[in-house]
């Protein structure tokens, strides 16, 4: 807060000191990377390029953070996350004689996915820890995304074979087909539900993308479709309403189709974003806008979704236009169905397309 306040006032020396303290005393990698990245910006603003380079390189090592990915892009480095995203092949021969594995496969074949989840997790608890990476890949092959995610977070420490499992890529498709790039949809599903298809929030939001039944009902009515809340437990239906709502937010004047604002509206609703448009003095800087969002949950949500989105693009070996744009302090627009992103630089209220 102190650093950002000084930054807005143009006191970059005070901002540098504040951001340096954030980086040194951070309690987690996300906060440390943020302190390093903004410290690097302040170092450049105070004409200390050697300090800028040092801080950017340190931030880039925190490869699974929002600012770590931005730092790597700004330096022209291949992100560590892209190197790790290369998935090995499933070694079925080492698993095919394990009863719990055979049971899980059989259960998936008859549509009993929750029981299959239980069987694979039980095998992980009683089996050879060296098989966790293989079991994670099997969970992915069986479309057991929540269990694959579980392996990614509860597998052996520092095991890179399960790091990709933290970002499942299930073979699902919305009922109306993909109109929004899957990387962005899965980025939301990961944060909203950890890919649990039947989870219900205290507010009543349901399923993968935590869609509110009232929101889905309105979208269905506009299309002349029938709707039942229980349908949101089905991946294809939930993804359809989730992407439809993102499209609706994209087309609202208050978001301008800019990706960070669409993501913020998905979390907080359109009305707060409309208010922030007039209250936040971001000087055309998208990163300053994100850090100035007054709702701490939404502020963190935007960074997490973008981080997830970029890593999904890396998993699919795709370029990331939004990452490239934000690393140059430009506003990324909402991606098209192929994931292509255009960016715009906004300075003093003037929008210059690039």
Task: Give the label of every model feature segment.
Residues 3-5, 41:
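Tandem amphipathic alpha-helical repeat scaffolds
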Residues 5-14, 25-34, 46-51, 55-59, ...:
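Catalytic glycan-binding domains that act on GlcNAc-containing polysaccharides
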Residues 13-23, 76-89, 111-120:
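Repeat-mediated protein-protein interaction surfaces in helical alpha-solenoids
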Residues 64, 76-80, 310:
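Non-catalytic alpha-helical coupling and interface elements of nucleotide-dependent molecular machines
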Residues 64, 97, 113, 128-129:
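Alpha-helix initiation and capping sites
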Residues 83-112, 322-323, 327, 336-339:
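Acidic, serine/threonine-rich low-complexity intrinsically disordered linkers/hinges in large eukaryotic
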């Amino acid at each position: 807060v102190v650093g950002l306040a000084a930054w807005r006032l143009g006191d970059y020396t005070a901002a540098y000191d504040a951001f340096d303290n954030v980086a040194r005393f951070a309690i987690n990698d996300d906060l440390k990377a943020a302190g390093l990245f903004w410290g690097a910006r302040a170092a450049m603003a105070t004409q200390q390029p050697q300090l800028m380079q040092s801080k950017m390189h340190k931030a880039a090592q925190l490869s699974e953070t929002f600012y770590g990915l931005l730092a790597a892009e700004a330096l022209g480095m291949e992100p560590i996350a892209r190197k790790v995203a290369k998935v090995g092949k499933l070694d079925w021969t080492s698993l095919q004689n394990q009863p719990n594995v055979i049971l899980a496969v059989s259960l998936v074949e008859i549509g009993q996915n929750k029981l299959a989840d239980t069987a694979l997790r039980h095998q992980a608890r009683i089996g050879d820890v060296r098989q966790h990476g293989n079991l994670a890949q099997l969970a992915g092959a069986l479309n057991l995304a929540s269990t694959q995610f579980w392996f990614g977070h509860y597998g052996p420490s520092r095991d890179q074979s399960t790091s990709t499992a933290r970002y499942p890529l299930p073979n699902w498709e919305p009922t109306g087909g993909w109109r929004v790039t899957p990387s962005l949809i899965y980025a939301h599903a990961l944060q909203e539900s950890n890919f649990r298809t039947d989870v219900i929030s205290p507010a009543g939001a349901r399923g993968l993308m935590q869609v509110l039944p009232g929101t889905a009902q309105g979208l269905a009515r506009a299309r002349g479709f029938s709707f039942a809340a229980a349908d949101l437990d089905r991946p294809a239906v939930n993804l359809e309403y989730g992407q439809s709502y993102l499209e609706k937010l994209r087309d609202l004047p208050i978001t301008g189709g800019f990706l960070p604002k669409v993501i913020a509206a998905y979390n907080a609703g359109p009305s707060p974003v409309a208010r922030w448009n007039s209250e936040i003095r971001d000087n055309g800087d998208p990163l300053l806008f994100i850090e100035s969002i007054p709702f701490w949950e939404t502020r963190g949500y935007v960074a997490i979704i973008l981080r997830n989105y970029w890593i999904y693009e890396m998993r699919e070996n795709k370029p990331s236009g939004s990452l490239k744009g934000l690393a140059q302090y430009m506003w990324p627009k909402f991606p098209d169905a192929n994931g292509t992103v255009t960016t715009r630089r906004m300075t003093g209220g003037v929008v210059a397309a690039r």
